[in-house]
C-alpha cells in the first residue's frame, strides 16, 4: 500500500537525519535509531533515562542485515540463530568489534533479533539494515502499548511510525548464543 510505503520512507529519512523513531513491534512499541549514529544512541539512552551500561538491541528484517555484527560466528551458531528467526527471539552474540560502545554497553556481547513484524521488516529493508530497538518507555516504567502512550511519554522528542502491534503478549526471549542460557522468557 502506497500510504505505508510513504510513511516508511518518511521514517527512514528521519532516521538518516539522526531522529529517534518510535514504532510498533511484536509485543510493545519500540524506540530506535541508526545503530551507527553515536549522537542518536546517546539521545535515546538519555531520553529513556537508561543506564548506558545495559546496552541496546539491534532489530533486523532478515539475518543478512545483521551480517557485519555476526561475522566470526561459526556455522553451528549461525544455524541456531537462523532456526529461531524471524520471531520474538533475541540472542546475545559475541561482539566482533563492529558494535558501537553505547550499543554494546558494558558487555562483550551484543543483543540481536530478526523481527517477524511486517512493518519492522519493511522499515529495516527500506533503511538498508538493522535499527536499534528498545522498549518505548523511561527506565522503570511500563512499555508503551500505543502511539498515544508514546506521545504521552516522549512528546515531540521522537518521530512516530504508527501501526499495529504484532500480537505477542510479552517482549522477546533473550538467550546467550555461547552458553545457551535463557536470560528472559
Swiss-Prot record:
Residue span(s) of domain YrdC-like: 5-185
SUPFAM superfamilies listed in its UniProt record: YrdC/RibB
One GO cellular component, as annotated: cytoplasm
GO MF terms held by the record: ATP binding; double-stranded RNA binding; L-threonylcarbamoyladenylate synthase; tRNA binding
Localization annotation: Cytoplasm
Keyword annotations of the record: ATP-binding, Cytoplasm, Nucleotide-binding, Nucleotidyltransferase, Transferase, tRNA processing
InterPro entries: DHBP_synth_RibB-like_a/b_dom, Sua5-like_dom, TC-AMP_synthase, TC-AMP_synthase_SUA5
Gene Ontology biological process terms, A to Z: regulation of translational fidelity; tRNA threonylcarbamoyladenosine modification
Disulfide bonds: none
Principal EC category: transferase
EC code(s) of this entry: 2.7.7.87
Catalytic activity of the protein: L-threonine + hydrogencarbonate + ATP = L-threonylcarbamoyladenylate + diphosphate + H2O
Alphabetical list of Pfam families matching this protein: Sua5_yciO_yrdC (PF01300)
Keyword Nucleotidyltransferase among UniProt keywords: yes
HAMAP family: TsaC
Family: Belongs to the SUA5 family. TsaC subfamily.
Function description: Required for the formation of a threonylcarbamoyl group on adenosine at position 37 (t(6)A37) in tRNAs that read codons beginning with adenine. Catalyzes the conversion of L-threonine, HCO(3)(-)/CO(2) and ATP to give threonylcarbamoyl-AMP (TC-AMP) as the acyladenylate intermediate, with the release of diphosphate.
Name assigned to this protein: Threonylcarbamoyl-AMP synthase
Species per Swiss-Prot/TrEMBL record: Chromohalobacter salexigens (strain ATCC BAA-138 / DSM 3043 / CIP 106854 / NCIMB 13768 / 1H11)
Gene encoding the protein: tsaC
Amino acid at each position: 500500500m502506497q500510504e505505508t510505503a510513504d510513511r516508511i520512507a518518511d521514517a527512514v529519512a528521519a532516521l538518516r537525519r539522526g531522529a529517534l523513531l518510535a514504532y510498533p513491534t511484536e509485543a510493545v512499541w519500540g524506540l530506535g535509531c541508526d545503530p551507527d549514529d553515536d549522537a542518536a544512541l546517546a539521545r535515546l539512552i538519555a531520553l529513556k533515562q537508561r543506564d548506558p551500561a545495559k546496552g541496546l538491541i539491534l532489530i533486523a528484517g532478515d539475518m543478512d542485515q545483521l551480517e557485519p555484527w555476526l561475522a566470526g560466528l561459526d556455522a553451528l551458531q549461525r544455524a541456531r540463530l537462523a532456526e529461531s528467526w524471524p520471531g520474538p527471539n533475541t540472542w546475545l552474540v559475541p561482539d566482533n568489534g563492529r558494535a558501537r560502545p553505547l550499543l554494546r554497553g558494558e558487555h562483550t556481547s551484543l543483543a540481536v533479533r530478526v523481527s517477524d513484524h511486517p512493518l519492522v521488516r519493511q522499515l529495516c529493508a527500506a533503511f538498508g539494515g538493522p535499527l536499534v530497538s528498545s522498549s518505548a518507555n523511561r527506565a522503570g516504567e511500563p512499555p508503551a502499548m500505543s502511539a498515544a502512550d508514546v506521545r504521552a511519554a516522549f512528546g515531540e522528542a521522537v518521530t512516530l511510525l504508527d501501526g499495529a502491534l504484532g500480537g505477542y503478549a510479552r517482549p522477546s526471549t533473550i538467550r546467550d548464543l555461547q552458553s545457551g542460557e535463557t536470560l528472559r522468557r
